């Protein structure tokens, strides 16, 4: 049994029991995002969970936009969410908008009023909060709690017609102001908001609250298993109360699981919006963002995200996942599929003084050292090449096996070269290193005369492509997003992005946005879709080549 299957057993067992007992003939799950922002990796976990359960049990999974708050929602987010779900590899059975149920919700609210289970309240938001009480003190009843059914029906109809100002009245459920569950203390189910809605326009000026709308939406669609995160566990009795008292024909079951927390990662939509609004990142799809759009632009594949979400499974208690686990799955995917190339991101010119001027040759370098069937590619080699600046040191420490005066290394797929001279500018900065090569040491010839301890990569200075390389580190310094109560903006890593100008071998000349490469010794890179143009090739580093992380 896989980790994913084992971890998600408690939800699967519920579904299996329901099917075996004939409680349900089939299952219907749903992914119900609010279209007020871009989806992030936490939403991806919910998408994978719901759609995979639907697939496993031959059921259906709907995509429903929980669009009951007109002031925060936008069609832009609707379209981005649809794109993200498709990109992750899923097709919904039905597409719904909660706003399409507003008429039905209004009828159910009228039913509650007629049953004496709801009333119009004139308390201010501050007074409602004060009257609600605390976890240790019961609430106080609103002075408007015992209005007659007739008066409540009249006031609610006038609320709908737009006769009252925003915030002047609300419709509340009439339950129990002394309940130990604060959610039962006469929760608000409708508020006034004179705002245009992205889907219904100006038809409505009253809008249902989440706790009222969500169970009705599930019941209307015939959802069998309404899977949500743990913060809604205390809301489940209220969820069930609304389904029962609104006399819904279908009775969905709410099941809670732990939300996803990842080290060095902000998961709050409000905080992510703050990062965008304050210009700390360059948008919702910034490659440092944990949004699906950001991960896609960074270079993560749908398969890697799905495998990550399956591997972490579903738990009943909150925990934090190491961000290196997500990196593990993109490495696992790309090491099989990404073409190899050599690139120098911080170039230093190396001149081979005994190589014939004006000449070049074609070398063959393996595409994947672990897969002979991947074949080889042609790379040109000439008198001048670029190497990484960090691959040369004038005064190296012990056990430094790369290039330094008097030392010999192999240029990957080419020859041994020995450093003989260092050229500097007026500031003492190394600008060139002059070497000699040994023609007998060509790779692939079987030369065994002597060995070198270092192999470094390079690109032909006379046949390479200028490129920009964007190197990313975690955006948040602390492992825990809320470490010691510090404001999360204090934990922003000032070095989360480093931009380097370098060169890549000509095999990348036809690279298109979202193409992925393994760059020798550097890691896996993705061609940036936003900044790449015909004359400006930009690579985002997805992950480094190796990690100490071990999948348990």
UniProtKB/Swiss-Prot annotation:
Q: Give the subcellular location.
A: Cytoplasm
Q: What is its main location?
A: cytoplasm
Q: Report the SS bond pairs.
A: none
What PROSITE patterns does this protein's entry cite?
Answer: AA_TRNA_LIGASE_I
Q: Name one GO cellular component term.
A: cytosol
Entry superkingdom: Bacteria
Annotated residues that bind L-glutamine are located at 66, 210
Chain positions recorded as ATP binding sites: 34-36, 40-46, 229, 259-260, 267-269
Q: Name one Pfam family in it.
A: tRNA-synt_1c_C2
GO MF terms, alphabetically ordered: ATP binding; glutamine-tRNA ligase activity
Keywords, comma-separated and alphabetical: Aminoacyl-tRNA synthetase, ATP-binding, Cytoplasm, Ligase, Nucleotide-binding, Protein biosynthesis
- Give start-end ranges for motif 'HIGH' region: 33-43
**What Gene3D superfamilies does the annotation carry?**
Glutamyl-trna Synthetase, Domain 2, Glutamyl-tRNA Synthetase, Domain 3, HUPs, Ribosomal Protein L25, Chain P
Share an example GO biological-process annotation for this protein. glutaminyl-tRNA aminoacylation
Reactions catalysed according to its record: tRNA(Gln) + L-glutamine + ATP = L-glutaminyl-tRNA(Gln) + AMP + diphosphate
The UniProt annotation puts motif 'KMSKS' region at 266-270
Q: Could you tell me the EC number(s) of this protein?
A: 6.1.1.18
Record's subunit section = Monomer.
Give the record's family classification: Belongs to the class-I aminoacyl-tRNA synthetase family.
Q: Which HAMAP family match?
A: Gln_tRNA_synth (MF_00126)
Q: What is this protein called?
A: Glutamine--tRNA ligase
What organism, scientifically named, is this protein from? Clostridium perfringens (strain 13 / Type A)
Q: What is the lineage of its organism?
A: Bacteria, Bacillati, Bacillota, Clostridia, Eubacteriales
